[in-house]
Amino acid sequence: EEALPQITVIHKDLLEDGWQNSFEGADRVYHIAADPDVRGSARKSWEVYENNVSATVRVLEAMKEYDVKEIVFTSTSTVYGEASVIPTPETYSPMIPISIYGASKLACEAMISSYAATYGWHAWVYRFANIIGSRSTHGVIYDFVQKLRANPTELEILGDGSQSKSY
């Protein structure tokens, strides 16, 4: 944040009020807030919907209110579901998510697309796979790292080795 003084990072709960005026004078919004828990999304489907879809609509409404015409959105490769084409191109269809999380991010993409078309905005959507960071608690990369820490000479891979991913 200090290295890029022209960027304002908003550390707020997007489901609450009070952050919207931060968009005043902004040229572009980078919407990276989300509940990224694919595995846990089945247990807390309403919470995932609120934190992803409702929060995104609130961002879009604030953009409309403050006349911000560009949005960059971080989505996920889980919007593709069980893709039959590997590697999976961005134009792959139909997108049939198999997780609540993937469905919520696809709904966000649809809302962003509709707002952009309706209000003449520009939107960029990036579909990332296997995002990891210091607060990660699970996932394939996290599991690999934990297994290698436990035994640096051997990496146990689950499954029969025939699985493939688009990355």
Give residue ranges: language-model regions:
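Residue(s) in the substrate-gating loop at a strand-loop-helix junction
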Residues: 76
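NAD(P)H-binding glycine-rich loop region in Rossmannoid oxidoreductase-like domains
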Residues: 11-51
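Glycine-rich phosphate-binding loop and adjoining beta1-alpha1-beta2 segment
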Residues: 1-4
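A conserved pocket-lining segment of Rossmann-fold NAD(P)-dependent short-chain dehydrogenase/reductase
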Residues: 40-41, 91-96, 123-130, 146-167
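Catalytic helix-loop patch of NAD(P)-dependent Rossmann-fold dehydrogenases
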Residues: 43-58, 65, 70, 79-125, ...
